[in-house]
């Protein structure tokens, strides 16, 4: 931005110099300088001139002061801090200004073979990026592998399988591990994710993997399985994690096939173990399944239990944990008032609202402040793509991960999307004034998680440098035309009349060309009403 403004100032100075040089003859600048000496010029100045000069300089100084105050008010917090401050102060400032760019696993991630690969075959477009798939490979290694696997051939092979870049190579490596141990749960999970062409086939492989891992857990000498949070055997912890992962994917298969009660029961059973459910974000799956069966009271209890967000006036206490929590809480508040909302779309000040309506509007605003990329997808103002396997909180990737699964819940409630649209239209101009509310670091990080053919959501939209330069050139052209019109009124008037004549001729030629292709009565024909013919 600083470079563009410097360029514009230099361009302005250069254009003024060129303009003065071009008008040196008509303005008689050289003759005026030769005829009037500096001494006679200053002797002819009156006290009124000095008063006017003082007033003008004071006015200009005041304008500069106002613009400086406006600039520093809007750009406060960009710089790290004063140079005189201590290192501690600088580190505190940096932690406040730098946003969190941690990548989170999408708990609602689809099956690669049954869903992502079908999309790729139909559209010839890659739904996932290599960076996203590499993060998934790292997740699988941390969940399904441990240091005690050394010397066990099938698990050593699976370590190689998770690192393979191509899907076919991963499948072949997993088959090699199954050839050594037909009950290798990790290999069965990989085949369910990447080879099964339908959700039903993936469910069958996952059930087989669940039987294998439960048999392994029952074979331990100590039948009572230690909790994940306690210090215990690393292999047993790994097997417990695999068991939880498989149960979660089985519940997701039941959800996708319409067995909602079975899915909710599976998610509830998993949520009892706080450590594992938090690690895998099972609460998001449970909330979405409860929304599908319209168990809104259970959803409210889940929001209070897992996040504290959704309790009365909790939005005033702290930030929500995720877009799913914030927008689900807003949806529950909107549900109570959406049908009877009395606010006009173009009114900026809403009068006579009930406390429930004010609470719903505040909850929506709070959710939009956390992630403003969600409303365009819910309102279908932007085209939606398949969600990535990982997302960044407050980014476009999180908005896709939420809207892909929750848009039907908003459509089910009459008036919810209308109220969301009203609040969104009122929210955009207010937040667009604050350019520092959302960092551009999230946008650059989201580019690695989303496919290149996807048009990434940017909020707030900044004015491009090309548009700024175009506006500057238009202003300069108007200034030059005004100066020329003042200095050469006769010639300028003739030029303007010639330009107007050319414009009118172009318009008449265009109308004549169009009339040759279209009939003369096309406008009355389009404006006329079709008269229905009565049946005899």
Curated annotation (Swiss-Prot):
Protein location: Membrane
GO cellular component: a single term: membrane
Domain of life assignment: Eukaryota
Sequence intervals crossing the membrane: 3-23, 49-69, 465-485
Keywords for this protein: Coiled coil, Membrane, Transmembrane, Transmembrane helix
Cross-referenced SUPFAM superfamilies: TPR-like (SSF48452)
Chain coiled-coil ranges: 191-218
Main subcellular location: membrane
Family stated for the protein in its record: Belongs to the ST7 family.
PANTHER family given in the database record: PROTEIN ST7 HOMOLOG (PTHR12745:SF6), SUPPRESSION OF TUMORIGENICITY 7 (PTHR12745)
Name of the featured protein: Protein ST7 homolog
Organism: Caenorhabditis elegans
Lineage: Eukaryota, Metazoa, Ecdysozoa, Nematoda, Chromadorea
